[in-house]
Curated annotation (Swiss-Prot):
The keyword Disulfide bond does not apply. The keyword Methyltransferase does not apply. Its main location: membrane. Its EC number is 2.3.1.275. The chain crosses the membrane at residues 3-23, 55-75, 79-99, 111-131, 155-175. Catalyzes the transfer of an acyl group from acyl-phosphate (acyl-PO(4)) to glycerol-3-phosphate (G3P) to form lysophosphatidic acid (LPA). This enzyme utilizes acyl-phosphate as fatty acyl donor, but not acyl-CoA or acyl-ACP. This is Glycerol-3-phosphate acyltransferase. PANTHER family: GLYCEROL-3-PHOSPHATE ACYLTRANSFERASE-RELATED, INNER MEMBRANE PROTEIN YGIH.
């Protein structure tokens, strides 16, 4: 009994370390509890910061489920105790004591705990998530489908009815956390997974045409500021040589006129000198 309580406490406290909030604070990202879907999980961090931060949070969340289960198996706990340790880690992720009981939805932590509990079950759940997400592009639908099948995968592969209740409780908690997503899926308002590097990049990509689109709504607007500046620079560069050529031509004409005028003025002078002699 003492081992059971100890493992439950360890699982809950490790699950309460919310990696999404820590990663966002460390790298200066928005608070996932206040921005995006307002869920401090890997998918929301993916939307807010990019793929690298989303993967980082996903790995940390999975480790929160892996480490307590490995500890329980290392201490030779019974399979039921190991399953309840996994449940405690998921509950800690959903309702963390360190972050005012506002946590994530527990999908990555559940998959990590299942990988440590029974590797094949964890692989099957992860493969189900990837297949559903690949075909329908809904993270919530993939989570609901994969976690819902976890207890039945355990019955098929393990065949131990004692581990079914804690795994079924994990499924109920995950479904409860996804209740809003479930309603949005029915209404067709659930956002799909977008593999953008950052939400800021989406804003920057759309920003150059916003002012022009407001002035000319309903029309395609092309940004020609760069082309116009290039044209003006080229025009100025072309005009400058023409002015120089014109000045050189004027100088040549004046010099020719001076040369033609000079002989006319000198010839009469020579004649007058000879006549005097």
């Amino acid at each position: 009994m003492a081992l059971f309580i100890f493992l439950i406490l360890v699982g809950y406290l490790m699950g309460s370390i919310n990696s999404a909030i820590i990663v966002c604070r460390t790298f200066g990202l928005p608070d996932p509890r206040e921005e995006g879907s307002k869920n401090p999980g890997a998918t929301n961090v993916l939307r807010l910061g990019g793929k690298q931060y989303g993967i980082m949070v996903m790995v940390f969340d999975a480790l929160k489920g892996i480490l307590p289960v490995i500890l329980a198996k290392f201490l030779s706990a019974e399979p039921v105790t190991v399953a309840f340790t996994a449940l405690a880690a998921v509950v800690g992720h959903m309702y963390p004591v360190f972050f005012h009981f506002r946590g994530g939805k527990g999908v990555a932590t559940t998959i990590g705990a299942l990988l440590a509990f029974h590797f094949i079950i964890g692989v099957m759940v992860a493969a189900t998530w990837l297949l559903v997400a690949n075909f329908w592009r809904y993270s919530s639908l993939a989570s609901i489908a994969s976690i819902s099948l976890a207890p039945f995968y355990s019955l098929i592969l393990v065949g131990n009815l004692n581990i079914f209740p804690p795994l079924f409780m994990i499924t109920i908690l995950v479904l409860y956390k996804h209740r809003d997503n479930f309603n949005r899926l029915i209404d067709g308002k659930e956002p799909k997974i977008k593999f953008k590097h950052s939400v800021i990049e989406e804003i920057m990509e759309a920003s150059p045409a916003t002012s022009a689109e407001q002035e000319f709504p309903g029309k395609e607007v092309i940004d020609t500021n760069i082309d116009e500046t290039e044209k003006t620079e080229q025009a100025e560069a072309v005009k400058k040589p023409k002015v120089k050529k014109a000045t050189t031509k004027a100088k040549k004409t004046t010099s020719k006129e001076e040369t033609t005028k000079k002989p006319k003025s000198t010839k009469p002078k020579t004649k007058t000198v000879k006549e005097k002699e």
